[in-house]
């Protein structure tokens, strides 16, 4: 079980996301993270442990600033609790948060490795992020439709 949130608006996105995750923290204590679109670049802050660890990290490193973002609190299902397995996962084009289980992630991961993709985490979520990149056409809706046709399981995704 995980908690996922998204925000688009006029306020400082990082604060809104972290405050929203605080209300969902009971859904996951293993790690927390956010991704914020800052001046056209996706900035990710994430870490192992409770949401307070993320707050402290952003206080030390400087928080991302923007008006669009996604956030996640994690209860680990695939991969141990670690900074690397924390969400969000993604790349320069797409970043995601995920709640649930992708049942066929191993098969998708094997296919993507054969296509030249590499993985850093042990999560099923990273597999979906790479699949979004693989199918990316420039049209987000078309890309998401293709990915949803491939993945099996019970899940919710926040995609940015």
Positions of PLM-derived features:
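Conserved short alpha-helical segments that host acidic/polar catalytic motifs at enzyme active sites
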Residues: 1-160
